[in-house]
Design a protein with these regions (language model features):
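ATP-binding N-lobe of GHMP and related small-molecule kinases
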Residues: 1-115
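DPxDG-like acidic metal-binding loop motif
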Residues: 118-120
Length: 120
């Protein structure tokens, strides 16, 4: 499965009532812009994303981190955290608490800068 999560600009934000868990509900309007990451999940190491050409343009350095549960490859904009703190890996761990999943091969070509207010 390949997806292209778009960057987005927040056009409006309204903080509403406080919830019992201490967080607040939000009303917001997002506008997608034509900048996106490329994300691929597979159960097969032979898929295009895990070949040298993969989802990564030629010449882009690719980092790889593997455990018994997943192989995570990333290239493009540097992800400034250990793989275990990456939201993709945290989400995968939460899903694995409820579902038996095979070893997953995850590739991320990061193009949306983190912390830039673009949803990256």
């Amino acid at each position: 499965m390949i997806c292209h999560p778009n960057a987005k600009i927040n056009l409006g934000l309204n903080v509403t009532e406080r919830r019992p868990d201490g967080y607040h509900n939000l009303e917001t309007v997002f506008y997608p812009i034509p900048l996106c990451d490329t994300l691929q999940f597979s159960t097969d190491a032979g898929t295009d994303s895990h070949r040298p050409e993969g989802i990564f343009p030629n010449g882009i350095p690719v980092q790889e981190h593997s455990t018994e549960d997943y192989t995570f490859r990333s290239g493009g904009i540097d992800i400034d955290c250990p793989p275990e703190q990456n939201l993709l890996i945290k989400g995968l761990r939460l899903i694995r608490e409820h579902y038996a999943l095979p070893h997953l091969y995850i590739s991320l070509h990061k193009q949306i800068p983190s912390g830039a207010g673009l949803g990256g």
